[in-house]
Amino acid sequence: PNQAAAEMRARLEQRLGGKRAVAAMTIGTFHAICLKLLGDVRLISPGEALTIAEQVLRESGRKGGGKTLLQSVSRVKNGVSPEDTGLDAELYGAYQARLRDLGALDFDDLLTEGLKRDVTGLRCFRHVLVDEFQDINDIQYQLVRSWSRSGELFVIGDPDQSIYGFRGADCRCFQRLQEE
């Protein structure tokens, strides 16, 4: 498991009286929770994603590196507009088509697919706690709101400490939450 999630679990176990006290809790990163909610999915490795990106570039006759394409694809999937990333819609479509053909998801698809699945009312939590709230992006914000729709939401963060704007993080999430 993710180191931050493991540390959070350990702190909760210590404060609440052991492993049994937190056994029923869902603790993890957005990606880990979405993976758990999605169930049996084929998640490609970063190496496989790079191979696919390089194939897409080669087949399109475009120049550029697979890593650059993957970075742009990731930013778009995390809420940055394609115009801001310079990502060509044709390349994005070809990359996604290749994933569909393989019946697979990449790391960033976990959030978008998790949100699609959750919109059907699949999962709602009684209590949702989010640490480092200033670093979430729009997709993660939508997940938080969906997961907490029938429960309590508690967020921790500092809008002045947001460092992931390049990945789509939006510290205005605090204001947005307050307005809703």
Model-derived segments and spans:
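P-loop NTPase Walker
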Residues: P1-L43
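A short helix->loop->beta-strand "cap" motif at the edges of active sites that frequently abuts
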Residues: V22, R149-E152
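Walker B catalytic acidic pair
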Residues: E132, D158
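Generic structural signal for coil-to-beta-strand starts
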Residues: E152-F154, D160
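Accessory N-terminal region flanking or inserted into the helicase ATPase core
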Residues: V56-L129, D138-L143, V155, G165, ...
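Conserved nucleotide-binding/hydrolysis micro-motifs of P-loop NTPases
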Residues: N2-A5, H31-C34, P159-I163, G168-C171
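Conserved P-loop NTPase catalytic core
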Residues: R172-E180
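N-terminal membrane-targeting/anchoring modules of bacterial envelope and secretion proteins
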Residues: L43, L50-L57
